[in-house]
């Protein structure tokens, strides 16, 4: 038998361009957008339905996206615990949104565009079809300019709570325009009606915070403290500081007043990037999955741009945080990232989704920030990872 040998340049061509010359990111790929589209994957969110199905979503941002006039969000469903996913819906006019179940119904809450109105939609069939938020009785709940991210809703004291940021300020500059605030509604109210929702006052940017190094607070989490008070815990953008901080804003029982003491900044690993905090009633600890800055990466760039590691962290008091276990890591931080993690408990496991930047069959991602994948991950038996 004779063997025919291909010229070396053809071997190189087939290896590099056959679609097999790159390694897919870890986890299960839910969706992918090539950088050639000039659309990037943002705002990953996940929810576990009462029947055990998973629903996930992401939006699109970037030069060729519709983020500034009527943003697009895609909905996906998995009925096999995240092994496979099917796209079930595309929502026109939905951005920066989280998914949640309330009284057996599935909701998505965010804005209609970049710095848009706050809108909410309901699905009664597990994410296949959704209501349209076209007026104040059908999901257009707060008009104006607002900012948010896939952060949690919390039910407490007969109300459902969600942190957002007012995005009209003295400055139109990113970060400086954001004011911390909370919205809430009675648990038995019609969440699609604007009249059901109460807004707190908004707390604006203050250049004197953190000895003048404060540049923004954003992407707040509604969190119930150990002693039963509602707080808005926010990501802090302070790129000229070596440490990462969160801010803790106090919310009154009726949801109408937000207040802040300039001493209420606390060191928190990963808090210069978006995070989601949830309480685990079994361990009696608050948990989050955050972008830690690993040894050797300190000072390579501003803290908010280092997103190549995901770690489980815990706290008993929301003031002191401990890194428990690294879950994901890539040695490169410029073109690789696992970011904007949203997560849920599922029995003994944590399930989470990531806005992931990694190479694909078109080469590298546009940047670590401009992600080309949404990926699904599972932390098995997560309580064994937590120190006691």
Residue ranges and their predicted role:
Residues 1-23:
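Bacterial Sec-dependent N-terminal signal peptides
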Residues 273-274:
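Alpha-helical scaffolding within the catalytic cores
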Residues 338-341:
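Short glycine-rich, acidic/polar surface loops and turns
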